[in-house]
Amino acid sequence: MKLHRAYVYDHVRAEGVHVSLTSAEAVDVEGRLYADIGGDRSYLTPVSEGWHETEAAAREEAAVKVAAMAERLTAQAERIRNGGR
């Protein structure tokens, strides 16, 4: 599950879980979501307030990416209509 501004710290690996994730991801280990939200090293569960804030940020980030992609495709279609210019 990818989340905005989430980072899995060494304490996850200390529990015997090998992870290699970017700053845009978190990992669910036995029902617990391990992540860093705003510098707070802890794990979050889907019912915690941090989860909802992070989920909302992830949705917002995805919406921005989709809008940017739509703009690029629209511009590409316009160039094709204009003979590739």
Predicted regions and their residues:
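A short, exposed loop/beta-hairpin motif centered on an aromatic-Gly-Thr core
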Residues: 43-57, 61, 65
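Short N-terminal "domain-start" leader segments
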Residues: 1-38
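Short C-terminal domain-edge/linker segments immediately following a structured domain
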Residues: 37-40, 65, 81-83
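Amphipathic alpha-helical coiled-coil segments
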Residues: 59, 66-73, 80
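Short, solvent-exposed coil/turn linker segments
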Residues: 23, 40-47, 79
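Short intrinsically disordered terminal tails
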Residues: 1-2, 78-85
